[in-house]
Amino acid sequence: MREVAVGVLVLAVFVIVPLGQRVLGLDGQPASAHRFAAFTFLVGLSVCPGVIALALTLPWFFACARFGVGRGVHLLRSAVAFRLEPVSEAAAGVFLAVGAGWGCIAALGWRPLGFAPITVLLTAVHFHFAGFAFGAMAIRVRRERVNRWTAVVAVGWMVGVPLVALGITTSSLIEPIGAVTLATTGGLLGLLVVERSVRHRSGWLAVSGASLCFAMVLAAGYALAQQFGFRWLDLEMMERIHGMANAFGFALCGLIGWSRIDRIMSRKDEPLCVSP
């Protein structure tokens, strides 16, 4: 299970995060610096936990923290600080930094609140994908469709992600509330992404939206079943199915789809060069 979690994090740090930043048009960092931070993060999670492993993961944490602080400063300096989009961008930056922080905790081998090592690692995965990748997709959809539904998705995501984490760390009663909130929000985002796939004729977005709907229904069903003592799916199998659907089906396909759409749109906007 650890190997799967590390593999999904590799996808996040090398592909999902830079692709999400590019799709949103937000400042990241130079490609060489990003590759160095991502590589050392991978090495830090692959060696024996300890101080050296922690040191190897710190470049990625600092890169994510820099991005998160940058979005926060932009929000505070913005004349439209109370608009949903800059708030969402800041939240995505914060969630990414939190995910990197949990990766550092996993590398150190620390077990806060007595968590199992795999739970610490999966929390890092949660914030990279449910935190950053989900947010990037929600923000991108809202840029095309500013309406109540995209607003509900943005707010539900910003509330649901910390609620799930809070439920895991404090109260088993909060966890299903957070899971259902995030699952409902995810299902709505999935439908909006499918709708956008029809508009743009994008198979990538169609796969992304359908994968998210499936993953969110699975997550909500699992959380509710656990709460009421009905164990129809073990944790390892749920994490594998849910994680793969979210990582590859939703996040990767969705961000590739938006990247391709943006590239096509930019070509259409290029002025024609007419020879005299």
Residue ranges of predicted features:
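Hydrophobic alpha-helical transmembrane segments of multi-pass integral membrane proteins
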Residues: 1-274
